[in-house]
Amino acid sequence: LSQYSIRDYLARGWLTHDGMWFYNALNTLGIETANALNRAAIRSMAPMEMERTMTMLGITPGSLTTFPELADFMIRALDMVLPASILRHYHATIQPPDTFRWEWEPGECFAYKGIKLAGCVDRYSCGVIYRIGCWFDALGIEYRIEPNPDTCMMHEKGYCRGDIIVNLPG
């Protein structure tokens, strides 16, 4: 087995665990509580996730002071978190001087697919883009998301894409 296939297998396993956790919370507690718990877990995890990612990439806190440095870090962080078999359906482009543009291929967001199977996509609060926002919060970087998907954009509009505009000091 290649390192690529093992890494992809393990990362997909983590996403399956995440999905099954949400599914069981949904069935036990209802959609509102499952959404709230999911977002609370994401927010709680983000500081640890960013600290570990920075350590693995040899980046010191406070050193992401330019947009190119931040953009490179965020792309590498996403590459570490998402399995390649899923990441190939997600496209991030950098729009200097301050914008990350994201887009999922139509119907290919892993959360959309899982939540659709669970039968509650019409009431799901997007956790994927929320997680990226929490990463910026954990890094202490001001940003805004346009549009900011509180619900599942793929379900509502047939696509999921938007911009994250950052405001670095200086």
Residue ranges and their predicted role:
Residues 104-108:
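Short loop/turn segments at strand-loop or loop-helix junctions that form parts
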